[in-house]
């Protein structure tokens, strides 16, 4: 599907939007806190900033891409809605879930904030952050990065970074099987391992659980190559954070479709 095109684009410096319509996006932003009980300090904080394509795509492609973003960012139950309806639906469902999970404890702590000891103010505070950005319009493919942070108590929250990829013409999702020839895994794994060390500082590299990384289905495409994303705890401790490893196209031309 993309073999010669990807290789040629690297050599010639051609980017995907050349000769095609530029994709324009709309950003939907919401930032608010919703109290557990009226007058209380506990709340669920919701921050959303999501880009959705609005121009430069066919109607079916735009709908497919928007639904793909909504499904991974907000939940499958909101697919088929307008993007604004989906965002509002997510907020309402999240607030309901927060209150359902915590209101039963309100008589113990939340109703009597004056009785709390120091450090107890956020005992029932949750936080959700969702940010989605169009990363690249490359060679007939759109890559989108989605960051999701959640905190529902405990020592710290968790962050998830997802790469979403779509065929620009149709809006269909892109997987590794669409990009690489059969049996690509070993060759691509070798290339990823070769670039892992240079993607980290020495201390972080030495802390990894494993250096035998393999393709994990979480990636974005760009002129620079294919960038794989490894999440918190996936190949290293939480302190290292999210790890990105890029393999240039010219190093893996032999396994492209």
What function would you assign to each model-found segment?
Residues 1-15:
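Sec-dependent bacterial lipoprotein signal peptides
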């Amino acid at each position: 599907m993309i073999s010669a095109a990807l290789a040629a684009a690297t050599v010639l410096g051609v980017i995907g939007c050349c000769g095609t319509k530029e994709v324009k996006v709309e950003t939907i932003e919401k930032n608010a806190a919703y109290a557990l009980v009226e007058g209380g300090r506990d709340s669920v904080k919701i921050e959303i900033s999501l880009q959705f394509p609005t121009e430069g795509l066919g109607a079916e492609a735009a709908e497919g891409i928007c639904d793909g973003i909504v499904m991974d960012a907000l939940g499958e139950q909101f697919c088929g809605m307008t993007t604004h309806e989906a965002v509002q639906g997510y907020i309402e469902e999240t607030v309901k879930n927060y209150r359902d999970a915590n209101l039963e404890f309100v008589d113990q702590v939340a109703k009597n904030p004056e009785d709390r000891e120091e450090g107890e103010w956020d005992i029932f505070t949750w936080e959700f952050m969702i940010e989605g950005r169009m990363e690249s319009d490359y060679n007939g493919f759109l890559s989108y990065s989605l960051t999701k942070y959640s905190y529902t108590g405990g020592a710290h929250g968790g962050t998830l970074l997802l790469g979403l990829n779509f065929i620009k013409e149709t809006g269909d999702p892109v997987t590794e099987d669409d990009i690489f020839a059969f049996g690509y895994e070993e060759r691509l794994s070798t290339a990823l391992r070769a670039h892992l060390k240079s993607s980290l500082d020495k201390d972080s590299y030495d802390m990894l659980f494993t250096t035998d990384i393999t393709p994990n289905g979480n990636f974005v495409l760009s002129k620079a190559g294919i960038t794989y994303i490894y999440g918190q705890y996936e190949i290293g401790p939480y302190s290292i954070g999210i790890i990105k490893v890029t393999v240039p196209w010219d190093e893996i031309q032999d396994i492209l479709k």
